[in-house]
Each structure stands twice: as C-alpha cells, then as structure tokens.
Amino acid sequence: MTDAGKRILVMAGGTGGHVFPALAVAKYLAQQGWQVRWLGTADRMEARLVPQYGFDIDFIDIKGVRGNGLVRKLAAPFKVVRSILQAKAVIAEFKPDVVLGMGGFASGPGGVAAKLAGVPLVLHEQNAIPGMTNKLLSRIANQVLCAFKNTFTQVKAKVVGNPIRRELIALGAEPKQAADDALKVLVVGGSLGAKVFNDLMPEVVAALSKQQSITVWHQVGKDNLTGVKSAYQQQGQDGGVNVAEFIDDMEAAYRWADVVLCRAGALTVSELAAVGLPSILVPYPHAVDDHQTRNAQVLVEAGAAFLLPQAILDVNKLVSKLQLLANDRAELAQMGQRAREVAVLDATEQVAQVCIALAEKG
C-alpha cells in the first residue's frame, strides 16, 4: 500500500533536542511521499530551522508557565484556550491523517486540538523523565513512544529510542581509526556553550599536557570565543586547541574525537551511543526534574561513560578522568563499543511506522 498523499502534522520546538529528532522522522516520511507540516512557535528555533529543511510551518501563540510569576500563571488558561483554537484551525485546514508530538510549547495545545478533531495522536518523549506536556498528553494519546525504559509509569509506552540522523548511524558502523599518541578530546556545551567547561578546560589542558599529549576541539558557545581563546593562550595551550563558537559539522567532530566531554541532553546521549564514543557526562544541574542525570545513566550503567555532577566538578577530577583514558586506550575502545551496544539504530523508522499504521487505520 502506498503512503503517497498521507499527511502528518509534526509538533516540536524550543530546543534542538526536540526539533532534530522530529526532523529525522519528518524527512523519512517525506521520502515516502507524505505531506509534512509543522506546528511551532514563532520565537523559538523551529521558526528558523524547519523552513531550511523545506517544510511549511504554522505558529501558535503559547509559552511555558512553569516558574513564571502569578499574573502570567493566572492568564495562562486563557492563552492555552486561544492556542488550542489556533492549533485546531491549522488541523481543520491541513487535515492531517496523524499528528506527532515531540515536545516543546506547541505540542500541548496541538495535542489537545488533535484529540478534539478526532485525529490520531502519537507522542514521543526524548528524555528519561517526561516533560510536563507529554506527561499530560500521554493520557489522551493513541500511542506513546519513548527513548528510554521506565520513562512513563502511568501509561503503557513503547521504547523506540531517539531518532537521529542517518549520517551518525553510518559513522558508528565505520571501523575505528587507531588512536595516535595525542588524546583527542571533543568538548561540547550546547549552542550556548557550558560556562563550567569554558572556565575549567584551559587549566585542565595545561595540567594534563605536562603528562600526556592532548588535542582539544572546544565548542564554547555564542559570544564566548574571545574569552576562552585568551584563557587557553594564558595557559600556553593555544597550539593544540581548536576553539569554535559553534561546531556546524558534528559528524566530522565525532569522527575526529577519542572521547567527548559534554552535557547529557537526550539527543546527545543517543548520538554518543550511535557513533560509539566514550564520554564524560556533566548533566546540566538546572534541567527540569534533573532529567539529564537520568539520561546519562543509560551510558554510565553500560560502562560507556563517566558521570561527574557539576557540583563536584573541578580541574583535578577532569584531569584524573582524562589521564585514565589516555593511559588505557584498550578501555577507551571498549567504552566506545559498549556505547554502540546500547544504541537504538532504527528509532526513526519505528516512530514513522507507528504514524503510518495509525494513519492507515483512519
């Protein structure tokens, strides 16, 4: 049976952790002949990113309410009702066969609107602890999907992993290059960087380079380039360090690296598993419900990563972990293999197939 002419409304926004997995599914279905339309908010990253991939996007007016002041909380119910009506208008005009919610502010009103319109609703939760929107919508969704085991306790959910780009899955299948003398450390703090990495790494590299040859590729985040470069120079370490505001080609960065120092966002954890790289994970301490620590446990329990809470992170602890890996390349390689073993490599196809099945049921 052909799926040509089927329509899907994708709801995802706010962060790359929501948008990029949704784009992977959208691209897959578009290649099967599906019409894809997006629901998001005009002031978040999906407004810029989604059109670059060739998908039309509609906007609704909705913001988060957690942690906001009393006035905004009192006004929130009225804004939610308005945004549901906006989403319902999009659904009435586009007439999707299925709606896929993958997190972000637009998913809540869009999910309710789908239910009111009688359109099948699929949810996908990327994190080990579900966000508030998906927790609420899970009770009305036709199918709930998640990346990690034991994410949902109140509803039955199917574990499918996180959809990631095919290029990264292919990279993980490539034979690993023999490590040279210099330990290659990729430092990634997200698009905004991570202040703790920016503050500590120049001193870490200076201390480690006295005992071990090391090269570093450090993504420092927006507006941090000059300051971090200067800090490396002051430590006499600018020669073996590539400092970038943002790394556009993560495939190249992963291919280059021996080990990754990073946060533990759901997409990052899934990508590390897919490409088969060992890591040192420092969960973002202010993440809602500390979900990054739970995300990290997947790799830590597999023996593929070290977990260093930011509260105890210092130069000595980072030097110690990196020195350990530099001196035991066999363990470094085994950690990478363990990471690949926990990867779910067909998550994109699994999410898409659930959408296809529900659309065909009508």
Swiss-Prot record:
Record membrane topology: Peripheral membrane protein
Residues annotated as signal peptide: none
Domain of life: Bacteria
Gene3D superfamilies given in the database record: Glycogen Phosphorylase B (3.40.50.2000)
One Pfam family recorded for the sequence: Glyco_transf_28
A molecular function (GO) term: UDP-N-acetyl-D-glucosamine:N-acetylmuramoyl-L-alanyl-D-glutamyl-meso-2,6-diaminopimelyl-D-alanyl-D-alanine-diphosphoundecaprenol 4-beta-N-acetylglucosaminlytransferase activity
Pathway linked to the protein: Cell wall biogenesis; peptidoglycan biosynthesis
Catalytic activity: di-trans,octa-cis-undecaprenyl diphospho-N-acetyl-alpha-D-muramoyl-L-alanyl-D-glutamyl-meso-2,6-diaminopimeloyl-D-alanyl-D-alanine + UDP-N-acetyl-alpha-D-glucosamine = di-trans,octa-cis-undecaprenyl diphospho-[N-acetyl-alpha-D-glucosaminyl-(1->4)]-N-acetyl-alpha-D-muramoyl-L-alanyl-D-glutamyl-meso-2,6-diaminopimeloyl-D-alanyl-D-alanine + UDP + H(+)
Protein name (Swiss-Prot/TrEMBL): UDP-N-acetylglucosamine--N-acetylmuramyl-(pentapeptide) pyrophosphoryl-undecaprenol N-acetylglucosamine transferase
Organism: Shewanella sp. (strain MR-4)
Gene this chain is encoded by: murG
